Amino acid sequence: MAFDLLKDINKKVHFIGIGGVSMSGLAAVLLNAGYKVSGSDSKESEITNRLKEEGAKIYIGHSKDNLQDVDVVVYTAAIPSDNPEIIKAKEDNLILMDRAEFLGQIMKGHKFNVAVAGTHGKTTTTSMISHVALSADLDPTILVGGDLDIIHGNFRVGNSEYFITEACEYKQSFLRFFPYVGIILNIDADHLDFYKDINHIKDTFKQFVKLIPNDGYIIGNADDKKVMEVLEVAKCNVLTYGINNGDIQARNIEFNEKGCATFDVFRNEEKLLSLSLNVPGMHNVSNSLSAVCLAEIFNINADAIVSGLSSFGGAHKRFEYKGTKNDITVIDDYAHHPVEIKATLSTAKKMNHNKIVCVFQPHTYTRTKTLFNDFVKCFDDCDELVLMDIYAAREKDLGEINSDQLGDAIRAHGVKCTNVHSHEEALEYVNANLSKGDLLLTVGAGDVVKVGELFLN
Protein backbone atom coordinates (compact mmCIF):
# COMPACT_ATOMS: atom_id res chain seq x y z
CA MET A 1 0.00 0.00 0.00
CA ALA A 2 1.48 3.36 -0.99
CA PHE A 3 0.75 6.85 0.27
CA ASP A 4 1.73 9.55 -2.19
CA LEU A 5 2.53 11.89 0.66
CA LEU A 6 4.81 9.50 2.49
CA LYS A 7 6.79 8.05 -0.42
CA ASP A 8 9.96 10.05 0.16
CA ILE A 9 10.11 10.34 3.93
CA ASN A 10 11.01 7.98 6.74
CA LYS A 11 7.45 7.02 7.46
CA LYS A 12 7.29 8.36 11.02
CA VAL A 13 3.81 9.64 11.80
CA HIS A 14 2.48 11.15 15.04
CA PHE A 15 -1.25 11.34 15.88
CA ILE A 16 -2.54 13.98 18.31
CA GLY A 17 -5.58 12.38 19.96
CA ILE A 18 -4.62 8.84 18.93
CA GLY A 19 -7.16 7.33 21.34
CA GLY A 20 -10.09 8.76 19.41
CA VAL A 21 -12.37 6.50 17.39
CA SER A 22 -11.34 7.86 14.00
CA MET A 23 -7.64 8.45 14.69
CA SER A 24 -6.96 5.01 16.15
CA GLY A 25 -8.13 3.32 12.96
CA LEU A 26 -5.78 5.41 10.82
CA ALA A 27 -2.89 4.61 13.17
CA ALA A 28 -3.66 0.88 12.95
CA VAL A 29 -3.67 0.94 9.14
CA LEU A 30 -0.22 2.57 9.18
CA LEU A 31 1.20 0.17 11.75
CA ASN A 32 0.07 -2.77 9.65
CA ALA A 33 1.78 -1.29 6.59
CA GLY A 34 5.09 -1.02 8.46
CA TYR A 35 5.17 2.66 9.33
CA LYS A 36 6.57 3.94 12.61
CA VAL A 37 3.69 5.45 14.59
CA SER A 38 3.51 7.51 17.75
CA GLY A 39 0.61 9.34 19.31
CA SER A 40 -0.65 11.24 22.31
CA ASP A 41 -3.95 11.31 24.15
CA SER A 42 -5.31 12.89 27.31
CA LYS A 43 -5.93 9.51 28.92
CA GLU A 44 -5.08 5.83 28.68
CA SER A 45 -7.82 3.60 27.24
CA GLU A 46 -8.48 0.20 25.70
CA ILE A 47 -7.77 1.78 22.33
CA THR A 48 -4.37 3.22 23.32
CA ASN A 49 -3.39 -0.07 24.95
CA ARG A 50 -4.36 -2.00 21.81
CA LEU A 51 -2.27 0.34 19.64
CA LYS A 52 0.67 0.03 22.03
CA GLU A 53 0.50 -3.76 21.70
CA GLU A 54 0.59 -3.34 17.92
CA GLY A 55 3.78 -1.28 18.10
CA ALA A 56 2.77 2.36 18.52
CA LYS A 57 4.66 4.64 20.91
CA ILE A 58 1.94 6.13 23.13
CA TYR A 59 2.23 9.30 25.22
CA ILE A 60 -0.40 10.19 27.83
CA GLY A 61 -0.82 13.96 27.93
CA HIS A 62 0.16 16.56 25.32
CA SER A 63 3.68 17.99 25.28
CA LYS A 64 6.23 19.36 22.80
CA ASP A 65 8.53 16.56 23.98
CA ASN A 66 6.20 13.97 22.42
CA LEU A 67 7.36 14.89 18.91
CA GLN A 68 10.53 12.79 18.85
CA ASP A 69 11.96 12.06 15.39
CA VAL A 70 8.64 12.67 13.58
CA ASP A 71 7.94 13.60 9.94
CA VAL A 72 4.17 13.98 9.78
CA VAL A 73 1.72 15.14 12.45
CA VAL A 74 -1.99 14.28 12.13
CA TYR A 75 -4.67 16.04 14.20
CA THR A 76 -8.48 16.14 14.46
CA ALA A 77 -10.85 19.10 14.28
CA ALA A 78 -11.26 18.79 18.06
CA ILE A 79 -7.59 19.69 18.74
CA PRO A 80 -7.21 23.44 19.52
CA SER A 81 -4.60 25.52 17.68
CA ASP A 82 -2.77 26.25 20.96
CA ASN A 83 -2.04 22.54 21.54
CA PRO A 84 1.71 22.34 22.34
CA GLU A 85 2.26 19.57 19.79
CA ILE A 86 0.61 21.61 17.02
CA ILE A 87 2.82 24.58 17.95
CA LYS A 88 5.96 22.40 17.97
CA ALA A 89 5.05 20.85 14.58
CA LYS A 90 4.76 24.33 13.07
CA GLU A 91 8.03 25.47 14.65
CA ASP A 92 9.84 22.43 13.22
CA ASN A 93 8.19 22.78 9.77
CA LEU A 94 6.78 19.26 9.98
CA ILE A 95 4.05 18.14 7.58
CA LEU A 96 0.82 18.93 9.46
CA MET A 97 -2.41 17.31 8.23
CA ASP A 98 -5.92 17.07 9.59
CA ARG A 99 -7.54 13.65 9.92
CA ALA A 100 -9.76 13.92 6.83
CA GLU A 101 -6.89 14.88 4.54
CA PHE A 102 -4.76 12.05 5.91
CA LEU A 103 -7.58 9.54 5.49
CA GLY A 104 -7.84 10.70 1.89
CA GLN A 105 -4.15 9.87 1.43
CA ILE A 106 -4.77 6.35 2.78
CA MET A 107 -7.74 5.92 0.43
CA LYS A 108 -5.44 6.67 -2.51
CA GLY A 109 -3.72 3.37 -1.75
CA HIS A 110 -6.93 1.39 -2.41
CA LYS A 111 -8.99 0.93 -5.56
CA PHE A 112 -12.49 0.24 -4.21
CA ASN A 113 -13.11 2.95 -1.62
CA VAL A 114 -16.62 2.99 -0.14
CA ALA A 115 -17.58 6.22 1.65
CA VAL A 116 -20.83 6.21 3.65
CA ALA A 117 -22.29 9.72 3.98
CA GLY A 118 -25.50 11.24 5.33
CA THR A 119 -26.73 13.21 8.32
CA HIS A 120 -27.92 10.10 10.19
CA GLY A 121 -27.14 6.38 10.22
CA LYS A 122 -23.52 6.41 9.01
CA THR A 123 -22.09 4.18 11.74
CA THR A 124 -24.92 1.63 11.57
CA THR A 125 -24.82 1.46 7.77
CA THR A 126 -21.02 1.27 7.61
CA SER A 127 -21.28 -1.60 10.10
CA MET A 128 -23.93 -3.38 8.00
CA ILE A 129 -21.82 -3.00 4.86
CA SER A 130 -18.78 -4.29 6.73
CA HIS A 131 -20.70 -7.40 7.80
CA VAL A 132 -21.70 -8.08 4.19
CA ALA A 133 -18.15 -7.49 2.87
CA LEU A 134 -16.68 -9.83 5.49
CA SER A 135 -19.36 -12.42 4.77
CA ALA A 136 -18.34 -12.25 1.09
CA ASP A 137 -14.63 -12.70 2.00
CA LEU A 138 -13.61 -9.36 0.44
CA ASP A 139 -11.05 -8.89 3.27
CA PRO A 140 -11.74 -5.14 3.52
CA THR A 141 -10.02 -2.47 5.56
CA ILE A 142 -12.72 -0.92 7.76
CA LEU A 143 -12.93 2.36 9.69
CA VAL A 144 -16.20 2.78 11.59
CA GLY A 145 -17.37 5.46 14.04
CA GLY A 146 -18.25 3.04 16.84
CA ASP A 147 -17.25 -0.33 18.22
CA LEU A 148 -18.33 -3.29 16.10
CA ASP A 149 -18.21 -6.74 17.70
CA ILE A 150 -17.27 -8.65 14.53
CA ILE A 151 -14.01 -6.66 14.21
CA HIS A 152 -13.45 -6.35 18.01
CA GLY A 153 -13.32 -2.57 17.91
CA ASN A 154 -13.65 0.34 15.51
CA PHE A 155 -11.17 -0.67 12.82
CA ARG A 156 -9.96 -3.64 10.81
CA VAL A 157 -6.92 -3.79 8.56
CA GLY A 158 -7.45 -5.94 5.48
CA ASN A 159 -5.15 -6.96 2.64
CA SER A 160 -7.34 -6.21 -0.35
CA GLU A 161 -8.30 -3.25 -2.55
CA TYR A 162 -11.53 -2.76 -0.56
CA PHE A 163 -11.71 0.12 1.92
CA ILE A 164 -14.91 0.98 3.83
CA THR A 165 -15.27 4.16 5.88
CA GLU A 166 -17.75 6.68 7.19
CA ALA A 167 -17.71 10.03 5.41
CA CYS A 168 -18.64 12.88 7.74
CA GLU A 169 -19.85 16.16 6.26
CA TYR A 170 -18.78 18.25 9.29
CA LYS A 171 -16.51 21.08 8.10
CA GLN A 172 -16.70 19.45 4.63
CA SER A 173 -14.31 16.70 5.80
CA PHE A 174 -15.50 14.17 3.21
CA LEU A 175 -14.42 16.41 0.33
CA ARG A 176 -10.83 15.25 1.03
CA PHE A 177 -11.75 11.65 0.20
CA PHE A 178 -11.35 9.54 -2.97
CA PRO A 179 -14.53 7.44 -3.13
CA TYR A 180 -15.16 4.84 -5.82
CA VAL A 181 -18.59 4.24 -4.31
CA GLY A 182 -20.36 7.00 -2.39
CA ILE A 183 -23.50 6.37 -0.36
CA ILE A 184 -25.87 9.15 0.75
CA LEU A 185 -28.39 7.95 3.33
CA ASN A 186 -30.22 11.23 3.98
CA ILE A 187 -29.64 14.98 4.19
CA ASP A 188 -30.92 17.21 7.02
CA ALA A 189 -29.94 20.49 8.64
CA ASP A 190 -27.13 19.83 11.13
CA HIS A 191 -23.70 21.21 12.06
CA LEU A 192 -25.13 24.70 11.74
CA ASP A 193 -22.15 26.06 13.68
CA PHE A 194 -20.35 25.57 10.33
CA TYR A 195 -22.99 25.48 7.59
CA LYS A 196 -25.04 28.59 6.75
CA ASP A 197 -28.24 26.71 5.92
CA ILE A 198 -29.63 23.58 4.26
CA ASN A 199 -28.65 24.84 0.79
CA HIS A 200 -25.02 25.14 1.91
CA ILE A 201 -25.24 21.53 3.13
CA LYS A 202 -26.78 20.31 -0.15
CA ASP A 203 -24.10 22.12 -2.17
CA THR A 204 -21.43 20.33 -0.14
CA PHE A 205 -23.05 16.94 -0.80
CA LYS A 206 -23.13 17.81 -4.52
CA GLN A 207 -19.37 18.39 -4.36
CA PHE A 208 -19.04 14.98 -2.68
CA VAL A 209 -20.93 13.33 -5.58
CA LYS A 210 -18.63 15.05 -8.08
CA LEU A 211 -15.58 13.40 -6.44
CA ILE A 212 -16.67 9.99 -7.73
CA PRO A 213 -15.00 8.92 -11.01
CA ASN A 214 -17.18 8.29 -14.08
CA ASP A 215 -16.82 4.51 -13.73
CA GLY A 216 -17.69 4.71 -10.01
CA TYR A 217 -21.09 4.70 -8.31
CA ILE A 218 -23.27 6.90 -6.15
CA ILE A 219 -25.93 5.10 -4.09
CA GLY A 220 -28.76 7.31 -2.84
CA ASN A 221 -31.91 7.09 -0.75
CA ALA A 222 -34.79 7.69 -3.18
CA ASP A 223 -37.20 8.35 -0.29
CA ASP A 224 -35.24 11.52 0.58
CA LYS A 225 -36.04 14.43 -1.77
CA LYS A 226 -32.87 16.34 -0.84
CA VAL A 227 -30.72 13.30 -1.67
CA MET A 228 -32.40 12.91 -5.06
CA GLU A 229 -31.85 16.59 -5.79
CA VAL A 230 -28.13 16.19 -5.00
CA LEU A 231 -27.83 13.10 -7.24
CA GLU A 232 -28.81 15.19 -10.27
CA VAL A 233 -25.19 16.41 -10.57
CA ALA A 234 -23.79 12.85 -10.83
CA LYS A 235 -21.58 12.00 -13.82
CA CYS A 236 -20.98 8.46 -12.47
CA ASN A 237 -23.32 5.45 -12.28
CA VAL A 238 -26.37 6.02 -10.04
CA LEU A 239 -28.18 3.34 -8.02
CA THR A 240 -31.10 4.25 -5.75
CA TYR A 241 -33.03 2.47 -3.01
CA GLY A 242 -36.02 3.10 -0.79
CA ILE A 243 -39.04 1.81 1.05
CA ASN A 244 -41.37 3.41 -1.49
CA ASN A 245 -39.05 4.49 -4.31
CA GLY A 246 -35.81 3.59 -6.07
CA ASP A 247 -34.18 0.82 -8.08
CA ILE A 248 -33.96 -1.46 -5.04
CA GLN A 249 -36.98 -1.60 -2.71
CA ALA A 250 -38.22 -3.40 0.40
CA ARG A 251 -41.68 -4.97 0.15
CA ASN A 252 -43.92 -7.11 2.37
CA ILE A 253 -42.37 -5.63 5.54
CA GLU A 254 -43.37 -7.21 8.86
CA PHE A 255 -42.02 -6.43 12.35
CA ASN A 256 -41.58 -8.86 15.24
CA GLU A 257 -42.11 -8.08 18.95
CA LYS A 258 -38.58 -6.63 19.18
CA GLY A 259 -39.30 -4.20 16.35
CA CYS A 260 -37.03 -6.03 13.87
CA ALA A 261 -38.20 -6.40 10.27
CA THR A 262 -38.54 -9.30 7.84
CA PHE A 263 -39.06 -8.27 4.20
CA ASP A 264 -38.45 -9.05 0.53
CA VAL A 265 -35.95 -7.08 -1.56
CA PHE A 266 -36.82 -6.30 -5.19
CA ARG A 267 -34.82 -4.73 -8.00
CA ASN A 268 -37.52 -3.24 -10.18
CA GLU A 269 -39.94 -6.21 -10.42
CA GLU A 270 -37.38 -8.95 -9.80
CA LYS A 271 -37.21 -10.42 -6.30
CA LEU A 272 -33.55 -10.60 -5.23
CA LEU A 273 -33.81 -12.08 -1.73
CA SER A 274 -35.64 -12.11 1.61
CA LEU A 275 -34.09 -10.55 4.71
CA SER A 276 -34.64 -10.79 8.46
CA LEU A 277 -32.82 -8.06 10.38
CA ASN A 278 -31.53 -8.23 13.95
CA VAL A 279 -31.69 -4.46 14.44
CA PRO A 280 -35.03 -2.71 15.01
CA GLY A 281 -36.79 0.10 13.17
CA MET A 282 -37.95 1.08 9.70
CA HIS A 283 -34.86 3.28 9.33
CA ASN A 284 -32.72 0.14 9.50
CA VAL A 285 -34.76 -1.46 6.71
CA SER A 286 -33.75 1.57 4.65
CA ASN A 287 -30.11 1.40 5.77
CA SER A 288 -29.90 -2.29 4.87
CA LEU A 289 -31.08 -1.56 1.31
CA SER A 290 -28.00 0.61 0.75
CA ALA A 291 -25.90 -2.44 1.68
CA VAL A 292 -27.82 -4.51 -0.88
CA CYS A 293 -27.06 -1.83 -3.51
CA LEU A 294 -23.35 -2.06 -2.72
CA ALA A 295 -23.52 -5.86 -2.92
CA GLU A 296 -25.05 -5.55 -6.40
CA ILE A 297 -22.15 -3.33 -7.51
CA PHE A 298 -19.50 -5.74 -6.19
CA ASN A 299 -21.37 -8.87 -7.40
CA ILE A 300 -21.81 -10.25 -3.90
CA ASN A 301 -24.19 -13.21 -3.89
CA ALA A 302 -27.50 -13.36 -2.04
CA ASP A 303 -26.25 -15.86 0.57
CA ALA A 304 -23.46 -13.51 1.67
CA ILE A 305 -25.88 -10.56 1.84
CA VAL A 306 -28.39 -12.51 3.94
CA SER A 307 -25.67 -13.95 6.18
CA GLY A 308 -23.97 -10.58 6.65
CA LEU A 309 -27.09 -8.55 7.42
CA SER A 310 -28.81 -11.14 9.61
CA SER A 311 -25.66 -11.50 11.76
CA PHE A 312 -25.51 -7.75 12.45
CA GLY A 313 -26.92 -7.04 15.91
CA GLY A 314 -26.16 -3.33 16.00
CA ALA A 315 -23.20 -1.05 16.62
CA HIS A 316 -22.44 0.11 20.16
CA LYS A 317 -24.51 3.11 21.27
CA ARG A 318 -27.00 2.54 18.42
CA PHE A 319 -30.20 1.36 20.14
CA GLU A 320 -27.90 -0.73 22.32
CA TYR A 321 -29.44 -3.02 24.93
CA LYS A 322 -27.65 -2.27 28.22
CA GLY A 323 -29.49 -4.58 30.59
CA THR A 324 -32.64 -5.26 32.61
CA LYS A 325 -33.32 -4.57 36.29
CA ASN A 326 -36.64 -5.13 38.11
CA ASP A 327 -38.14 -5.97 34.69
CA ILE A 328 -37.19 -2.48 33.44
CA THR A 329 -35.27 -2.61 30.13
CA VAL A 330 -32.46 -0.09 29.55
CA ILE A 331 -31.46 0.95 26.02
CA ASP A 332 -28.84 3.55 25.05
CA ASP A 333 -28.84 5.47 21.78
CA TYR A 334 -26.48 8.03 20.24
CA ALA A 335 -29.34 10.03 18.64
CA HIS A 336 -28.71 13.76 19.04
CA HIS A 337 -30.63 15.27 16.10
CA PRO A 338 -34.46 15.58 16.13
CA VAL A 339 -34.84 13.27 13.11
CA GLU A 340 -32.72 10.59 14.84
CA ILE A 341 -34.60 10.98 18.12
CA LYS A 342 -37.95 10.52 16.35
CA ALA A 343 -36.65 7.34 14.68
CA THR A 344 -35.33 6.00 17.99
CA LEU A 345 -38.61 6.62 19.82
CA SER A 346 -40.63 5.20 16.92
CA THR A 347 -38.52 2.04 17.14
CA ALA A 348 -38.98 1.85 20.92
CA LYS A 349 -42.74 2.19 20.53
CA LYS A 350 -42.84 -1.04 18.47
CA MET A 351 -41.37 -3.00 21.42
CA ASN A 352 -43.35 -4.59 24.25
CA HIS A 353 -43.44 -2.08 27.12
CA ASN A 354 -45.71 -0.28 29.56
CA LYS A 355 -44.33 3.23 29.28
CA ILE A 356 -41.29 4.79 27.62
CA VAL A 357 -39.20 7.11 29.78
CA CYS A 358 -36.55 8.96 27.79
CA VAL A 359 -33.56 10.66 29.43
CA PHE A 360 -32.21 13.10 26.85
CA GLN A 361 -29.03 15.17 27.00
CA PRO A 362 -28.90 17.85 24.26
CA HIS A 363 -25.55 17.95 22.43
CA THR A 364 -23.99 21.40 21.79
CA TYR A 365 -25.55 24.84 22.25
CA THR A 366 -25.50 25.57 18.51
CA ARG A 367 -27.52 22.50 17.57
CA THR A 368 -30.01 23.07 20.41
CA LYS A 369 -30.52 26.71 19.40
CA THR A 370 -30.73 26.26 15.62
CA LEU A 371 -33.01 23.18 15.76
CA PHE A 372 -34.97 24.34 18.83
CA ASN A 373 -38.46 24.03 17.28
CA ASP A 374 -37.66 20.56 15.91
CA PHE A 375 -36.44 19.40 19.34
CA VAL A 376 -39.71 20.62 20.89
CA LYS A 377 -41.74 18.34 18.58
CA CYS A 378 -39.58 15.19 18.45
CA PHE A 379 -40.51 13.59 21.81
CA ASP A 380 -44.20 12.88 21.13
CA ASP A 381 -43.64 9.10 21.20
CA CYS A 382 -42.27 8.99 24.76
CA ASP A 383 -44.52 8.94 27.83
CA GLU A 384 -42.14 10.90 30.04
CA LEU A 385 -39.06 12.96 29.18
CA VAL A 386 -36.21 13.65 31.59
CA LEU A 387 -34.22 16.56 30.16
CA MET A 388 -30.59 17.04 31.20
CA ASP A 389 -28.38 20.11 30.79
CA ILE A 390 -26.79 20.74 27.40
CA TYR A 391 -23.54 18.82 26.80
CA ALA A 392 -21.12 21.48 25.54
CA ALA A 393 -18.68 19.19 23.65
CA ARG A 394 -16.43 21.56 21.67
CA GLU A 395 -18.42 24.73 22.45
CA LYS A 396 -18.50 27.50 25.06
CA ASP A 397 -21.73 28.54 26.79
CA LEU A 398 -22.58 32.01 25.48
CA GLY A 399 -25.72 32.21 27.61
CA GLU A 400 -28.05 32.17 24.59
CA ILE A 401 -29.78 28.83 25.21
CA ASN A 402 -30.27 26.32 28.03
CA SER A 403 -32.21 23.15 28.78
CA ASP A 404 -34.71 24.93 31.03
CA GLN A 405 -35.90 26.98 28.03
CA LEU A 406 -36.21 23.81 25.95
CA GLY A 407 -38.07 22.06 28.77
CA ASP A 408 -40.59 24.91 29.05
CA ALA A 409 -41.30 24.72 25.31
CA ILE A 410 -41.64 20.90 25.36
CA ARG A 411 -44.09 21.10 28.29
CA ALA A 412 -46.09 23.78 26.45
CA HIS A 413 -46.19 21.39 23.47
CA GLY A 414 -47.91 18.82 25.71
CA VAL A 415 -45.18 16.31 26.57
CA LYS A 416 -44.60 15.41 30.23
CA CYS A 417 -41.07 16.74 30.81
CA THR A 418 -38.88 17.14 33.90
CA ASN A 419 -35.61 19.11 33.89
CA VAL A 420 -32.68 17.70 35.88
CA HIS A 421 -29.19 19.10 36.33
CA SER A 422 -27.03 16.06 37.09
CA HIS A 423 -26.80 12.32 36.42
CA GLU A 424 -27.69 11.70 40.07
CA GLU A 425 -30.85 13.81 39.78
CA ALA A 426 -31.83 11.90 36.64
CA LEU A 427 -31.26 8.61 38.50
CA GLU A 428 -33.49 9.79 41.38
CA TYR A 429 -36.29 10.44 38.89
CA VAL A 430 -35.82 7.05 37.24
CA ASN A 431 -35.84 5.19 40.56
CA ALA A 432 -38.98 7.01 41.72
CA ASN A 433 -41.00 6.87 38.51
CA LEU A 434 -40.24 3.65 36.61
CA SER A 435 -41.85 0.31 37.34
CA LYS A 436 -42.08 -3.25 36.03
CA GLY A 437 -42.40 -3.47 32.23
CA ASP A 438 -41.19 0.08 31.55
CA LEU A 439 -38.54 1.01 28.98
CA LEU A 440 -35.72 3.39 29.94
CA LEU A 441 -34.02 5.10 27.00
CA THR A 442 -30.85 7.16 27.49
CA VAL A 443 -30.44 9.33 24.41
CA GLY A 444 -27.64 11.66 23.30
CA ALA A 445 -24.05 11.92 22.09
CA GLY A 446 -22.57 13.08 25.41
CA ASP A 447 -22.34 11.07 28.64
CA VAL A 448 -26.06 10.47 29.30
CA VAL A 449 -25.33 6.71 29.11
CA LYS A 450 -24.11 6.98 32.73
CA VAL A 451 -27.72 7.35 33.92
CA GLY A 452 -28.62 3.88 32.65
CA GLU A 453 -25.38 2.43 34.00
CA LEU A 454 -26.00 3.95 37.45
CA PHE A 455 -29.52 2.50 37.44
CA LEU A 456 -28.35 -1.00 36.45
CA ASN A 457 -25.51 -1.01 38.98
UniProtKB/Swiss-Prot annotation:
Gene Ontology biological process terms, A to Z: cell division; cell wall organization; peptidoglycan biosynthetic process; regulation of cell shape
Enzyme class: ligase
Origin superkingdom: Bacteria
Keyword Ribonucleoprotein part of the UniProt annotation: no
UniProt keyword annotations, A-Z: ATP-binding, Cell cycle, Cell division, Cell shape, Cell wall biogenesis/degradation, Cytoplasm, Ligase, Nucleotide-binding, Peptidoglycan synthesis
Pathway(s) it belongs to: Cell wall biogenesis; peptidoglycan biosynthesis
Cellular component terms (Gene Ontology): cytoplasm
Binding site for ATP: G118, T119, H120, G121, K122, T123, T124
Alphabetized Pfam families for the sequence: Mur_ligase, Mur_ligase_C, Mur_ligase_M
Signal peptide location: none
EC number: 6.3.2.8
InterPro entries xrefs: Mur-like_cat_sf (IPR036565), Mur_ligase_C (IPR004101), Mur_ligase_C_dom_sf (IPR036615), Mur_ligase_cen (IPR013221), Mur_ligase_N (IPR000713), MurCDEF_pg_biosynth (IPR050061), UDP-N-AcMur_Ala_ligase_MurC (IPR005758)
Subcellular location: Cytoplasm
GO MF annotation terms: ATP binding; UDP-N-acetylmuramate-L-alanine ligase activity
Catalysed reaction, written as an equation: UDP-N-acetyl-alpha-D-muramate + L-alanine + ATP = UDP-N-acetyl-alpha-D-muramoyl-L-alanine + ADP + phosphate + H(+)
Family: Belongs to the MurCDEF family.
Task of the protein: Cell wall formation.
NCBIfam families reported for this sequence: murC (TIGR01082)
Protein name: UDP-N-acetylmuramate--L-alanine ligase
Natural source organism: Clostridium perfringens (strain SM101 / Type A)
Gene: murC
